[in-house]
A protein has these predicted regions:
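Histidine-dependent nucleotide/RNA phosphoesterase domain, centered on the 2H-phosphoesterase fold
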Residues: 1-113
Length: 113
């Protein structure tokens, strides 16, 4: 199964993205439901089911050492990946340091599996 780490978008941001998408229809693909919009932090690729429990345990351990907090990130650019046919929103600004550290930690953790 293909796995990734992500954060849900705040409801107001998901609504804003959905409204933007309705005002700027794209001919290709199907829209992602608002409830599935997210900020991808680390893509793990293909993992086997037997790897899930150790991955979850390692993730819990890593996240237990972090203090949750809010991070602001402006979504100000759009792009398209032909394969798998995905439009994405991104930011031209560097993410806040705490968000960068979280993503880096999850990428390193995912690399162990």
């Amino acid at each position: 199964m293909r796995l990734f780490f992500a954060l849900d978008l705040p409801p107001a941001t998901a609504r804003a993205v959905t409204l933007w998408r309705e005002r700027n229809p794209i001919a290709a693909g199907r829209p992602v439901p608002a409830a599935n919009l997210h900020l991808t932090l680390a893509f793990l690729g293909e993992l086997e089911e037997r790897q899930l429990e150790p991955l979850c345990e390692a993730t819990d351990a890593q996240l237990a050492s972090r203090t949750p907090g809010a991070a602001r990130l402006a979504l100000d650019c759009v792009g398209y990946w032909p394969r798998p046919g995905v439009f994405w929103l991104g930011s031209t600004q560097a993410p806040p340091p705490a968000l960068q550290a979280l993503a880096r930690g999850l990428q390193q953790l995912g690399g162990r599996f």
